[in-house]
Amino acid sequence: MNYYLGLDVGGTAIKMGLFKETDELIDKLNFPTRTVEYLVDDIYQNIINLFNKNSINIDDLKGIGIGFPGHVDGETGIVVYSNNLVAHNFDIVGKLKEKINTYIRISNDANVAALGEFHFGKGKDFQNIVFVTLGTGVGGGIIVDGKMLEGKNGAGAEIGHMVISTNGHLCSCGRRGCFETYASATALIRNARVAMINNPTSLLWEIAESPEKLGGFTFFEALERKDKVATIIFEQYIEDLADGLTNLANIFRPDALILGGGISYRGDVLMEPLQQRLEKMIYGGQWNARVELMISELKNDAGIYGAYAMCSKRKK
């Protein structure tokens, strides 16, 4: 039996999934992300631990796929730039191959998550999808005709940095009005905190006690209790998110837009008004084929499934 590993490298933790060649996920683990000088050793040691735990010979490992945040050159295996992990021109594939002689492929983490959803999640019945993650920022991956769109040197598909509001909020990238400054979970809570300060009678004060304590759960509790301030903030959030998704739908005309990240799991409170707005705004409207709006099936495991798909040499 041949085995493969899918790795999803995050800013605080690394997820590792052990797969059989039959697509079965047989075990997974998480371990803390340390600075880059420790990264390869940490990955290697956890690979050994995982194989020993499952009584599998390391020689049966036929491939490793890695999703890594930032600008990643999949052809050379080099992390060109990763702000989250402070890694510049980091040859992670070369260093890991010095320890384990197997096929290794790497790509941007959001692209890899899209590949996972395409092969094993809600995208498996389609050939064209746009996968959008709503978290600390806005990430995403694009599958066109069954292939992952990475752009030159793997630097493409940075959908969180398309501008939806000229001279809008300042983004960490240095531009103003980027999609992620409006549609991320961070943006939603930022706006809610400002509104909370300006509205001392809002239920947000009763539920969260202070702006600093306001988070996703407390915000959505206020929304469920029909707090007026939370409702106004969320309606504006839907509009901003719909603006960006409409741009993506008009450019790529995918079979489906698939949303991941914690906010997407809120279900109908998000999806129903978002679908309605998209149908009104998409170019051609009722005269063009419907773009399906869906919630990720794989959720937090999309990255490891995509990394597995990438290294097991599937169509990509």
Model-derived regions: residue spans:
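ATP-binding/phosphotransfer module of carbohydrate and carboxylate kinases, centering on a glycine-rich
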Residues: M1-K62, D73-T76, G94-T102, H119-F126, ...
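Short beta-strand segments
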Residues: D8, G65-P69, F131-G137, G141-I143
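Short hydrophobic alpha-helix segments
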Residues: K28-F31, N83, K152
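A charged helix-plus-loop insertion that forms the helical arch/lid used to bind
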Residues: G77-H88
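General beta-strand structural signal in soluble alpha/beta enzymes
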Residues: I104-N108
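Adenylate-forming
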Residues: A114-H119, G140-I142, H161-M162
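Structural signature of FAD isoalloxazine-binding scaffolds in flavoprotein oxidoreductases
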Residues: A155-E158
